Structure formats: C-alpha cells, structure tokens
C-alpha cells in the first residue's frame, strides 16, 4: 500500500513537473541536472521537516492529500500553481542549486556541527555574489506572454523601487543572453529567485499577480530579500501553529541562520515580505501564524506596498556609501541615497526632517496635534455617515512635552473585514516609529486604552477597496506607564507527534482556531488532532459555527434605500426586496435573525460541530 501511495505521488509530481520544468527552463538559465537537484533537495527537506513534526507518519499519504488542496502564502496573494510547486520553496521562491543545498545542510544540522559558532540575524541574502552591481542599471525585459496591463503595473513597481532606493533598472529588450538580466513573464503564479543568479533570471507575474505589493514582493526576492518570518528571531514575534499547516508543507516554516543578513534592522510584522496568518492552511482559514502580540494579527501578510523597513533593508544592503556625514533626520528617518539632503521618513511622517505628518490622499484630514490633558478626538473621513470612500489615506502625528499619550477608541467602529486588513486604522506607539504598527479592521471596536512609549505617536487611516463607517479616536496627555491592552493569545498545544504501534489511536483535539467572522453566523473555526498510529479512521479536522450574534445595522442602509426610491422597473423591484431588511441586524444565509441571534436548521450545518 505504501508503495502504491508513493508511486501515485511520484507520478503526480512528474506530470506537474513536466509542465513546470518547461516553464522554468524557458525563463531561467537552468538545465535538467540543476532542476533535478533542486527538486530532490526540496523533497528531502519536506520529508525531514515532516518527520520532525509528525514522527513516523507516512509522508507520501500526506503529500497525496495536500496536492489536492489550494496553497497560498497570503490571502492577498494568488495560490501556488501545482505545476511548479515541486520546485518552489516557501511558495514563491525558485532556489538555485547552491541555495537549496545550503538550506538542507543547515536544517539537517550538517553545517552547525562543523561551524558551531556561526549565527546571524537575517532577512537579506548574505552572499556577496547575490547582489546586483550598483555601477550600472539592473537590466530587464518583458516576455511576449506579459499583457499590457501587467507591463504597466510592473513598470510602476520598478519605478517605486527606484524612487525610494539607489537602485536603477533599465528595460533592455535586446539584452544579450550571456548578460545578467531579469525577464518578467506570465507564468503559473507569482515567483522569483533570490538575488542575482547569473544569465536570464525570470520573475513570474502570473494571472492575478498584478497587485502592486505582489509585484514589489517578487522584485524584492530578485534583488536579495527573503521572507520576513524566515529570520531566526521570528519566534520572538510569531508562533507557528503546526496543527493547522498542510502536513507536507511544514518545511516552508523553517527559521534559518546563515542564508541572509538583517543588517541590524528590527523585525517588521508589516513587511510586504511576510507570510499572512493563513499561509499553507489546511482549510485556507485556520491560522498557521499567530503573532505574539495579538494586536498585530491583522497586520501580517499585507500586499499593499513596501513597508518602510523593506525599503531600508535594500538601502542598507546596496546604498550605505551614498550619503556621508551625520543623519539629521528625526523619528527613524534617514537621508535618501539619491538625494542626501532629503529624508526618507517612516510611514505617516513627512517633512524636511520627518517631524511633520504625511499629506493626505483623496481626503481633507490628518494633521499635527499638540496633545493636552483634556481629551481631543480625530475621526476618519465622513465618520460615521456617509463614511469613508475607497483609496483614501490620513495621517496624524501626536506630540506632547514631557508626558506620554493615551489613546481610546470611542463611538462606532466598522471597516471592511479581512484576515489581513486592507481598509484599516493603524497605531504606532512604540519608541521606534519605523516598524508597522497595530492595524485594526472589521466591526469590533478595540477595547481599553493604549499608552505610547514616548511623547510622540502616529495614527494612520487607510482605505483601499470599500466605503464604510470608519473610526473615532480620542487622545490625551498622561503620566501612565506605556501599555497596550491586547486580548490574550490563544496558543494551540501541538500533540506529541510520536507514532505508536496499532491503529486508530488519536491524540487529543487541539484548541479551536479563532472565528473567521465577528458576527452573522457565517464564520467558522476549526481544530485538528494528530493520528498517533500509522493509520486512523475518522476525521483529522472538525469545524464549528461561531459568533452567532447578528451583525450591526449597516450605516449605509438608509442611503441605499433613499437611492432606491428614485428607481423604477423590475430590476429596481428586486433591489428593493434585497434592501428591505437592511435596517435590521443581519445574518448570513442559511441563518436567519431570531431575537438578535442567528439560527438555522439547514442540513448544510450537519458537518459542523458545536464548539464548547
């Protein structure tokens, strides 16, 4: 039986790899032997990590089951294409043969035995040969498979990298094949190599990969950046929930010591290079990464744009010799490597020395506020009605002399609800204003008060996709000690992965995951258990409904009903029927609102347990 399962996995991987191999050979300077080596090393790495996590459980069976499920590293990034996945590390990295072997050696402990004192703190490739030269532009060209819309967005992403770093790129359609260059092509998904590897080096911008932050992410790989959560210090900021990872993908959550260099920069949970909270999830909703500080949970996985520390990573790696003299920039800013008399400022800050607020976008809002002992309030555009509009941004800088600043959310609170916030309010109250702050969205108002570490803080409002109510926040000067008031983190205890004799012996169920929705009945949560024997009957994972309280009344409902009154015809009648109940607390189908609680007797719920 084991032989048949392994044979199935081999045949499936072979069929997928035939298509994937042709794509990789066409757009990268790699041959059959290199591809075979990379594929073999990644398979060994997967088996090694699987054995460490699950003991003697059959890898082949898990790999077969996992191959049927979609995989993504962030909800804001497309799923990994199965044809190329056997050759990709961490979902979107095509390793060189040397890189793959080095990672396997490090993870298996071979290097640590021969070099026990070697250790680093890393997020940028440490190999000197992996850096592109700064004496000439990085050449690139577009393959004919790239459509005009993708070309336009790639050019915008390249220009943004150029605007904030010392790097220069040059479109060279006639670049010689023996030169080093990047080739953008429409492949199966979004992926890239790490750093400069020589010759033609592809960056796949596949279908649904054209969002600015996704393209910037893949270019980041091409110029030397690894994923943020691969740093050896990542466990101080995140916890990996192995119970909820697709078992054959646990190797994609390894922390490594020797491949890359952090250049002394702090960990950034808002990096565009960070996994999302449901990366490689068994059900695309259970969280595989839990932030140690739960206030950052909705920050990780963003694909809006480069974070300030993403930019500083490249500037430290490539541009540290561009500006001499002292750094007069304030609040974590530093001289722009192309204009040394200008400061690059952390998100939300601006001005000659980074002491002012960043100008607003498509709204009249923001400002620099001198905090007093009495409460002062700010609010998002249009709060609470008609609410904010898409693609707006506001920035406030709060300052006080000799005291700290206390913040508290008041009145109403509502944003587009996503696991990684797309529309959000962000709070930066730490002593270091460079890293991304806490980001909140959805419908639950943050409870309690928050106190800054120093006498300055930054609040950022950002909308990208929708209109909604937004937020209102009040602030005052205080002598209270710095604090946040996060809800406790629910840490899942991973069952011991020891394989024992016999059959059908399960470990205890793990803890329930967080609910995927805050109200309305359509949220789910799940938990898993580990088979202690080689085979077990029954379900490895079970699901439960959760948060059955009806959602609040939509603040835009009255506006929609008013618009509907001027509409006539059959289409408008259907719209009127759909809107007729929007002045009542809402439940998701198949639930109905019964005295404020969402209830249903639908057979669809037969597969769901009731969590206790």
UniProtKB/Swiss-Prot annotation:
Broad class of where this protein is predominantly found: secreted
Localisation: Secreted
Binding site for Zn(2+): 217, 221, 227
Gene Ontology cellular-component terms listed: extracellular region
Range of residues in the leader sequence: 1-16
Gene source species: Haemonchus contortus (Barber pole worm)
Note on how the cofactor is bound: Binds 1 zinc ion per subunit.
Activity regulation behaviour: Inhibited by 1,10-phenanthroline.
GO molecular function: metalloendopeptidase activity; zinc ion binding
Function: Metalloprotease. Involved in molting, a process during larval stages in which a new cuticle is formed and the old cuticle is shed.
Protein name (database record): Zinc metalloproteinase nas-36
Keyword Ribonucleoprotein: no
Enzyme category, top tier: hydrolase
Stretches assigned to the Peptidase M12A domain: 123-320
